[in-house]
Amino acid sequence: MEAIKPEDLNNHIGAVRSTSWFTVTQEMINQFADVSDDHQFIHVDPEQATPIFGSTIAHGALMLSLSIGKGYETALVVEGTKMAMNYGYDQVRFINPVPVDSKCRFNSSLLEVNDKGGGRLLLKFNIELD
């Protein structure tokens, strides 16, 4: 992956970068339920979830977590960066359920570049599930 000079970041605003497609499996959902201690039936019990959603559905927090790991596929690497950190989330919404065995990918686009001084940059992205 080619590193981008900090002064060139504004040239990347609005460009959509997509991750590879992946499948949300019941095993992933079950493992996340175990780690998060969220065993709500809509996630882990197909018999109870199917009349409501047609199948079990992924946790919203699972999908948010996957956006981080999958996001490395499309990350903008800034030249000279020693460390990058997640600063937080704005306006996170879980608008539609993600049924088990869904094929998904994340689309991200750079919205803003803010120079915070002292060699620090704050990059704001929009990330959507496809």
Identify what each model region corresponds to.
Residues 1-58:
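Catalytic strand-loop segment that frames the active site of acyl-thioester-processing enzymes
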Residues 1-12, 96-130:
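HotDog/MaoC-like acyl-thioester-processing domains
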Residues 52-55, 68-107, 111:
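Hydrophobic beta-strand-centered segment that forms part of the acyl-chain substrate-binding groove
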Residues 30-33, 64-68:
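Predominant activation on well-ordered alpha-helical scaffold segments within soluble catalytic domains
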